[in-house]
Curated annotation (Swiss-Prot):
Entry's Gene Ontology BP terms: valyl-tRNA aminoacylation
InterPro entries: aa-tRNA-synth_I_CS, aa-tRNA-synth_Ia, Anticodon_Ia_Val, M/V/L/I-tRNA-synth_anticd-bd, Rossmann-like_a/b/a_fold, tRNA-bd_arm, tRNAsynth_Ia_anticodon-bd, Val-tRNA_synth_C_sf
Residue positions of motif 'KMSKS' region: 554-558
Enzyme Commission numbers on file: 6.1.1.9
UniProt function note: Catalyzes the attachment of valine to tRNA(Val). As ValRS can inadvertently accommodate and process structurally similar amino acids such as threonine, to avoid such errors, it has a 'posttransfer' editing activity that hydrolyzes mischarged Thr-tRNA(Val) in a tRNA-dependent manner.
Top enzyme category: ligase
Lineage: superkingdom: Bacteria
GN (gene name): valS
Coiled-coil parts of chain: 842-910
Family: Belongs to the class-I aminoacyl-tRNA synthetase family. ValS type 1 subfamily.
Protein known as: Valine--tRNA ligase
Organism: Brucella melitensis biotype 1 (strain ATCC 23456 / CCUG 17765 / NCTC 10094 / 16M)
Amino acid sequence: MLEKTYDAAATEPKIAERWEEAGAFKAGAGAKPGADPFAVVIPPPNVTGSLHMGHALNNTIQDIMVRFERMRGKNVLWQPGMDHAGIATQMVVERQLAERKEPNRHAMGREKFIERIWQWKAESGGMISNQLRRLGASCDWSRERFTMDEGLSRAVLEVFVTLYKQGLIYRDKRLVNWDPKLLTAISDIEVESREIKGHLWHFRYPLENVPFDPENPHTYIIVATTRPETMLGDTGVAVNPKDERYHALVGNDVILPLVGRHIPIVADDYADPEAGSGTVKITPAHDFNDFEVGKRNNLRAINILTPEAAITLKDNVDFLEDLELTAELKALIVELDGMDRFAARKRIVELMDERGYLEKIDDHTHAVPHGDRGGVPIEPYLTDQWYVNAGELAKPAMAAVRDGRTQIVPKNWEKTYFDWMENIQPWCVSRQLWWGHQIPAWYGPDSHCFVEKSEAEAKAAARAHYGEDVALERDTDVLDTWFSSALWPFSTLGWPDKTPELATYYPTSVLVTGFDILFFWVARMMMMGLHFMEEIPFHTVYLHALVRDKHGAKMSKSKGNVIDPLELMDEYGADALRFTLAIMAAQGRDVKLDPARIAGYRNFGTKLWNATRFAQMNGVKLAPDFRPENAKLAVNRWILTELTRATRAVTEGIATYRFNEAAGAAYRFVWNQFCDWYLEFLKPIFMGDDEAAKAEAQATAAYCLDQVYKLLHPFMPFMTEELWSLTASEGKKRDTVLALAEWPELSFEDEDAAADINWLVDLVTGIRSVRAEMNVPAGAIAPVVVLDANKVTVDRFARHDAAIKRLARVERISFEQQAPKGAAQMLLGEATICIPLGSLIDLQAEAARLAKEAGKIAAEMDRIEKKLANEKFVANAREEVVEAERERLLELKEAAQRVATAESRIRDAS
């Protein structure tokens, strides 16, 4: 007999151990002979990471598919691993050194510091792997990989050197996102926009050959900027070619205030004639758009910042070129050189004001890009970096999606994919860090570059180049973490070696990931997979949405609305969390997570546990020779039919990535049809004297529960595994763990039995609804009068007389030609069901109660409708607040409909 309650905390570790002992998650475990492969690579979490809700959703979805396909007998591999997370890991270890008052990385030296990171990884890294196991992730943990392990590092070297020799990797001076705190280039995904209350400064730039007069607008043009310090690097002013105000000025120069540099006025579509004065100052070395304008118009790029974002003028050859060093300019250089960018901003504005160049200052709230790790505003910065020719690699990756070799689900994301790929920029792959794959480039005495897989090979290449041995210096930069991640689907399978795993599992079947890394990771895996394997890396990309809080707001520490999945698992168990995420994971829709929902789905697990316990108490046990087609009782043939239908719906739902529909179908069958109705129908049979009926009911219930454990296993693996082991045939053990049991393939259906019992369910449900709407006391028994019933319906009433009376609290059933006075009515098929209410409730009092309720609902609806009609409210209120009001309005409309139905019934009864 089962324990009275299911203890998730005690059971889950025990079940995990059982799976481990059975080798249930090993590649190919439980596969049928000659089975098709089903391979999934996990999006590698950062080695520094801890499980968050995004991981929980992502890995729940993967695990549902992996367990499902394993039970279907496929040759399954779920490949786990972790990312070395360059910046994040380096920062964690640097912080640890500071906390322990140990020498910093510069004092320690590169080699010792990297040793220290490996030591940290051995002690603390990989916590997330254990957290994923706790969630129930059925990866082949014996194959866990790390993006810095030896095999993957070899793959990285092979790819870098090959691309370099093919001319697809090169060094170039371009703008990058530069973090002046961490002193490295960072990728777009590591940049977060923050709304800042700042200013827009409007400056007067004097026209050449005209004496400058602040009072005379014909002697200058006005430009506006949010970053006055960058004006020191201005090399042009752009106007729109269609803007007639400036036609005569195009080709002339303005004089850069404070500096005295002559800079041209150029015609370029980037300038918006509708925005401000229609002119734009162009600083190619400090703005991504300006960089492109500069290239189009042959403008110089003058960098005026140090890597730490201080002003550099004194020894800045580019800045000083062609300038007349007046006493005023020399004083400016002395004052500003070495000054922090924000202090320089303040001083430049003061100087512009003093000298008559400041037109006005506007308050201006705007988005300022910050480094998500360093936390300071980033600078577009001109440096020498390594680049991949992404445009060339993108072509086959676009073709693969266009011709359907790789499908993106939901399909609407394909447009985003193509938009990105068609406008792709060179990919900056170098980072100024120590932790990561060091770039395999060595420089000779004249800076000639040798890119090889090892120092020995670089020395041999240098010897061939110079005709003698020379000292080589290795590039100190490391590769962008996304570079090694882009090789993940084939590097984890042993490439560049030709391994059996690579031959079996590549291309992989499906990739499950968040839409936010479609470009940063998915597109790059497509590029690398097609280039090096000449084959797509995956057949399907399933993009899931975000997990938000219950109001639809994005979770963030600053808002204090972060939901911790580990805490949820502590409180409700892993199964409840997983099932909640699955049933809410509708394609393309964010998951609004309310912990109350998780409590509700824990109750679903409790319902299944209690149903199994109830079954055991009534002698339900597996009958080895049970066959659905041999069942005789309509109620058994009905539940077996509904089981087949539910199995079909769950199977189709998982197979088509509609996880919410699959979970919903399982939920409805278990909670509604099996627990609420079938077990209720069985009670008189279990208590009766018909032993044959009892035996058939026991065998049917056992069979159904056995299939239910299988259907629910991908969603709720722990509880179902426990129930499976505790409900084996008497005196026997199960042949296998549930994780390796065969997925149900059911075909039994009896349309007549299903129609018959579903009619009974609809009748009882309808009568109960009317009673609830009419406020009929729960204990009151009422007669039922039936009008217009055909022979089939009359027979059904006769056949189910006892069940109707017991379940719907019906006193007697009669068939009449006319509805009795004071009766509420409902339609069921061709018949009208009348429930006389006069003797059960005070119709007048009930009518008054309903009228009052209708008034309250109408007033509340009116209030919300006025609110939503207010454009100011919709524009200024937080998105989740507006959404909550819309949802409340929908709820009220449904409530109003219910009250209107009840009022109509009262009128009919009166």
